Amino acid sequence: MTDALTITRDLIRCPSVTPADAGALGVLEALLKQAGFTTHRVTFSEPGTADIDNLYARIGTEGPHITFAGHTDVVPPGDEASWSLPAFSGEVKDGYIYGRGAVDMKGGIACSVAAALDYLRDHGSQPKGSISFLITGDEEDVSINGTIKLLQWAADRGETFDHCVLGEPSNQEVMGDCIKIGRRGSQSGTLIVEGKQGHVAYPHRASNPVPDISRLIVALSDEPLDNGSAQFQPSNLEFTTVDVGNTATNVIAGIARAKFNIRYNDCHTQESLRALVEQRLAKACGNRIRAHIDWLPSNSDVFLTKPGPFTDLAVAAIEEVTGRKPELSTTGGTSDARFISSYCPVIEFGLVGQTMHQIDERASVADIATLTKIYRGILDRYFA
């Protein structure tokens, strides 16, 4: 079996903090080229953002076509002096491989590559269809020059995908406890309340926006947006900052702002959600409070891969290796699956995510072996 642990180590040793690649894609490209994949390195640009390198590799020309997706970029390591082992060492200690990206998600990518190479080795270097890899270096930051553009680039070339496995760390506690089959949408905005600046000693000459924005925050937060759906938990609106831009104690501010984020389910579209919140705001304002919402652009719409043959196949592979039947979940934050879902059904399954983004991020060596076996089981069933 191809050593997924070695690939994980080699990837961790590339300090690929977004937007730097630091050689990570080269590690993967060399392995895939040697196995017969046709590879493409594609760089995308956008004014005001860093250029990002991406990798697309495919073997086979027919269907069915399964693609493994992922990202080699990582978040900064934080205070490196606080790490038990160097953050980009990829050292193994007490059954764990340490390093930024071990869990999120260089370990998952390494396992998918190792599984694909083993499958090809056992089947005459050709799948009964096609296997590809969609790997970006722009997931942990703005996600502008990464998967979303790589998918469009592939589509413009005539590439089509039947199914996708995204190797994000989906498991909560142990390997095999969770597959992500969808994600809630994400919409952010700023609530702005207009008052009138003045001296605190003469409140009748001013209009204080602070009490008003407080009332509106309560009004928008208290009433549920929905009761959830068959596959999703209830949507939630959370205010995250309140600011008046005023450092003086004797001045009534003229304007107040409160930022918020909504994680919403399939009871809403982006448009209907905005309309609902605007309607509630207008009701709470009445004829007295002057307020409006500045909505931020969002590319994080809700999606769901409905349970069916593909999810059944993945569940069977997981259950065979781990003895556990995974939960089909839609919890958690956003991922690049939101982009992939526009092109094909996508599931997320990877390592246990308990230490991702933390000091001493680490993956169990045993879990890496387990995930490789599961991915191999998915390929065996997919091309059966």
UniProtKB/Swiss-Prot annotation:
Keywords: Amino-acid biosynthesis, Cobalt, Diaminopimelate biosynthesis, Hydrolase, Lysine biosynthesis, Metal-binding, Zinc. InterPro entries: Bact_exopeptidase_dim_dom, DapE_proteobac, Peptidase_M20, Peptidase_M20_dimer, Peptidase_M20A. The lineage of its organism: Bacteria, Pseudomonadati, Pseudomonadota, Alphaproteobacteria, Hyphomicrobiales. The active site is at residues 73, 139. PANTHER family: ACETYLORNITHINE DEACETYLASE, N-ACETYL-L-CITRULLINE DEACETYLASE. One of its GO terms (molecular function) is acetylornithine deacetylase activity. Belongs to the peptidase M20A family. DapE subfamily. Its EC number is 3.5.1.18. SUPFAM superfamilies: Bacterial exopeptidase dimerisation domain, Zn-dependent exopeptidases. It comes from the Bacteria. This is Succinyl-diaminopimelate desuccinylase. Zn(2+) 1 binds at residues 71, 104, 168. It comes from Bradyrhizobium sp. (strain ORS 278). The keyword Cell division does not apply. Pathway: Amino-acid biosynthesis; L-lysine biosynthesis via DAP pathway; LL-2,6-diaminopimelate from (S)-tetrahydrodipicolinate (succinylase route): step 3/3. GO terms for biological process: diaminopimelate biosynthetic process; L-arginine biosynthetic process; lysine biosynthetic process via diaminopimelate. Disulfide bonds: none annotated. Gene3D superfamilies: Zn peptidases. Catalyzes the hydrolysis of N-succinyl-L,L-diaminopimelic acid (SDAP), forming succinate and LL-2,6-diaminopimelate (DAP), an intermediate involved in the bacterial biosynthesis of lysine and meso-diaminopimelic acid, an essential component of bacterial cell walls. Its cofactor is Zn(2+); Co(2+). The gene is dapE.
